[in-house]
Amino acid sequence: MKSAPFVALAFVISFATTTKAAETSSPNPVDFSPAARRAIAAPYLAEVDAEFRRFAEEKRLPGAVWGIVIDAELVHTGTFGLADLDRRAPVTKETRFRIASMSKSFTAAAILRLRDEGRLHLQDPVAKHVPELAATPPVTRDTPPTSIEHLLTMSAGFPEDNPWGDRQLDVTDETFRDFLAAGVSFASTTGTAYEYSNLGYALLGRIITRVAGLPYQEYIRRELLAPLGMKDTVWDPRDVPAGKIALGYQREGAAWLPEPLLNDGAYGAMGGLVTTLPDFARYAAMHLAAWPPRDDVESLPVRRATLREMHQARMPSGFAATEKSLAGEPQPNVSSYGYGLVWNLDSRGTVRIGHSGGLPGYGSNWRFYPDHGFAVISFANLRYAGTSAVNTRVGAILIEKAGLPRRPVIVSPILQQRSREVADVLIRRTAAGTPEPFAMNFFLDHDRERWRREADDLVQMLGKIEAVSNVQPVNALRGTFQILGEKGSLEVFFTLTPERNPLVQELKMKLRRAGG
């Protein structure tokens, strides 16, 4: 299978000095509601469709379908071409596609759900649940036992197996058992390197079956697909009503040749799911709903904290040094494999998480942007269609051109309090006897009298003080605010301690002249 700093607007508050400071105008806060973001995206959806259609034509795809999810809603879909060339049946948004390795995160979610139920541990040796693997000795005597987590993160040491693994999809449980009992080969020492392995995810399927006491397909259907309302998602293409599935093709010269459609089998856990765009959008919405962390009652098939575990960088898997933004500016990114998902961070600080899928006859990709609250999904019925590239461009259109915002960071009460206290210290508004907001290290790191002189000099350069902005949080214990004066502004960055009553451990100031 082929895989592939928050900014919150400042509310400006006025304060009284010897003469009353004027209020500055307060910019509007970010409206992160689904309706507001739908309105931002709407004028660019025609460009999104044009991007997908251009890709489909350039790649000569038989057919394709794509969609945009914002929070819990599939807000836009588009289609291209044919699901069945002989019947000239067009692709619709309800057409079933095999999504290949996009299935892996379902398998990972099932493993983590069993972990949450106390039925397995991620550090369990795989051989505890798949005794047939005990026939394979470790690479070296000091190699750790291959664990469930090694399988999840593609670090078991098995060789990359895309061409071979893609043809194993329909092998029987008995054939798979015999294969394992004969022993398997390693390409690298367990736990030391990333290498993409379909075998690893087939083993995870076998673990689910053993631990749950029912086939992994049924466990995932019962615990994930059914609760999400994914009624048109199945493991075996034979379960799709006649005429409802996109047939897979490969290209030979100018011709499209049909690819055989493999039935479900022991390797399905690595890439066997068949689904529709609306069904998969429900799954994408579940992952989006894991963000931000909050106190709400749990309502998803998998705990929100567990989903966020899946979304973390676990095993470094790539560095794209030459990537560029839509405007052509350098925008390198790094990627890591998590639990059934690929985590990616670019030089703007934008995080995207998702997975590609590729099989003989099919190619697909999805990614979601947890800080922006949207997802991009696309399926095609051409062998290894590689829709990751177009999904990347569409994500960039929605962020860079449309301007979909990042989710604002909520200002913690202590951060707001300390910002006001620091401002009072800097502009000498602190009453005698008021406790300092500084931690015990602060005036060990800075000579008190020299720091006071330097701070006074900077504040005096502002001229008449007009306002202090609300703090712009980086997180609950770190942020920036500005002291605004007639001759410029003073940007103040500060970080609080991990104490029960957090105090200021670090503070940096930067003067910005008016008109500079």
Q: Which residues does each PLM region occupy?
A:
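Short, well-ordered beta-strand elements
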Residues: 354-355, 365-368, 372-381, 491-493, ...
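Short, gly/Ser/Thr-rich active-site loops of penicillin-recognizing serine hydrolases
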Residues: 315-324, 350, 378-450, 515-516
